[in-house]
Amino acid sequence: MPSATYLLEESYETLEAIETGDRHHLREELGDLLLQVAFHARIAEEDTADPWSVDDVAGDVVDKLVRRHPHVFGSEQADTAADVEASWHARKALEKGRGSAVDGVPMALPALSLAGTLMHRAASAGVHVEPGDDDGLGSRLMHLVAQAQADGLDAETELRAACRRYVARVRDSEG
């Protein structure tokens, strides 16, 4: 398997540990993610064209946190979590030269998460567009994601919880 596949798998295992509240499993999976960071950084160190290390990664994240949180590290004020998020996205857009609220959203996200992220970003930027443009399944799913957001829910999390309940019912019926 490609190394990116392992990284993605470990990320999902970490998500599962968080959602199930299994702190021992979470500790184990965070260790596996940390191993992935170290592994990919080690590969990067051997790149003769553009080498960098795990120390460079750590330094970059510290610099990013300082730049994007002037309410903590500078003199700006953010009164709410929404203010913090808006400031973060505005600074990130400037740094990356993004012109749209939806620029930079990875289209490889799981589809329900992708839909939720796109709609959240658009709404946060004051852009209100109907989630679906026809009566096809994709548009209906977009509307369901929008409804979940309006209800304060995350569609991806809700569907995973429903899948866990389904698995339990299947196991029960198998006797």
Spans of features found by a protein language model:
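Flexible "arm" and connector segments at domain edges
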Residues: 1-29, 35-175
